[in-house]
């Protein structure tokens, strides 16, 4: 599935038209996660659909969802901008950024400098770079470009060998462990436990996907995660405020 998405991205990049730059201040994604509202930082995801689950939220108003997340004390937001596979839009991110005061991560499949520039222009405070989608040297180049523009970067891996190859090139500030295998789309929070021991000191560790309960939060926190990225389990609820409070057992 990842290979199919990357091929689609390569086609899309050929026709990118860069928008005007969104004139909203940059916010520190990293600092928000370093100073969370609860025992573990929460990146709450604004997501309409996914390839594995199909349509997740039929009545989808990104600004309302984002405002609910902020009211429930999420620390940062993630917005899906991929159109073909996740029914996202770049405009969703810009709209969310203009609605809330939280830092916003652009969740997409970024493989080219043009997408980094596009992310900056639509207002992203941080971008996602996927270890399984790029050679470590390519990932490092895009990482540096994003940092030079004042954006944070969440470097995501699923597999320990991918992490080891990246660490031979550089050490990211923020490292995400994707508990979902992007080849099979199966999830297991034990993936965080498995890979966390390889994460160097000084990396802010984020556990992503498959997190749906207080027990999951406590498990990944115990194994070194300082923050989590949660999407589907929050988006499926009628009230995103209640969903966050339920996740934390409040």
UniProtKB/Swiss-Prot annotation:
Transmembrane stretches, start-end: none
Pfam families, per the entry: IGPS
ATP-binding keyword on record: no
Taxonomic superkingdom: Bacteria
This protein's UniProt keywords: Amino-acid biosynthesis, Aromatic amino acid biosynthesis, Decarboxylase, Lyase, Tryptophan biosynthesis
Molecular function GO terms recorded: indole-3-glycerol-phosphate synthase activity; phosphoribosylanthranilate isomerase activity
GO biological process, one term: L-tryptophan biosynthetic process
NCBIfam families assigned to the protein according to its UniProt record, in alphabetical order: PRK00278.2-2, PRK00278.2-4
Family that this chain belongs to: Belongs to the TrpC family.
Reaction(s) the record says it catalyses: 1-(2-carboxyphenylamino)-1-deoxy-D-ribulose 5-phosphate + H(+) = (1S,2R)-1-C-(indol-3-yl)glycerol 3-phosphate + CO2 + H2O
Pathway of action: Amino-acid biosynthesis; L-tryptophan biosynthesis; L-tryptophan from chorismate: step 4/5
Name by which UniProt lists this protein: Indole-3-glycerol phosphate synthase
Enzyme nomenclature, EC number: 4.1.1.48
EC primary class: lyase
Gene: trpC
CDD domains the record matches: IGPS
InterPro entries: Aldolase_TIM, Indole-3-glycerol_P_synth, Indole-3-glycerol_P_synth_dom, Indole-3-GlycerolPSynthase_CS, RibuloseP-bd_barrel
């Amino acid at each position: 599935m990842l290979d199919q998405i990357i091929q689609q991205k390569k086609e899309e990049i050929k026709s990118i038209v860069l928008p005007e730059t969104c004139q909203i201040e940059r916010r520190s994604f990293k600092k928000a996660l370093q100073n969370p509202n609860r025992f573990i930082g929460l990146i709450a995801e604004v997501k309409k659909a996914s390839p594995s689950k199909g349509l997740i939220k039929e009545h989808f108003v990104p600004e309302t969802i984002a405002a609910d997340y902020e009211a429930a004390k999420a620390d940062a937001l993630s917005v899906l901008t991929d159109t073909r596979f996740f029914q996202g839009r770049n405009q969703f991110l810009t709209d969310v950024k203009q609605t809330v005061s939280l830092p916003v991560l652009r969740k997409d499949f970024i493989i080219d400098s043009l997408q980094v520039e596009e992310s900056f222009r639509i207002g992203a405070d941080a971008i996602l770079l996927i270890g399984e989608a790029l050679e470590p040297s390519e990932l490092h180049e895009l990482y540096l470009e994003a940092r030079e523009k004042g954006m944070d970067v969440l470097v995501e891996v699923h597999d320990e060998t991918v992490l080891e190859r990246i660490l031979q090139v550089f050490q990211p500030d923020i490292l995400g462990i994707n508990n979902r295998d992007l080849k099979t789309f199966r999830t297991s929070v034990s993936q965080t436990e498995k890979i966390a021991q390889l994460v160097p000191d000084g990396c802010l560790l984020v556990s992503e996907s498959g997190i749906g309960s207080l027990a999951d939060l406590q498990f990944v926190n115990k194994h070194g995660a300082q923050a989590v990225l949660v999407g589907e389990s929050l988006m499926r609820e009628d009230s995103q405020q209640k969903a966050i409070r339920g996740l934390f057992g409040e």
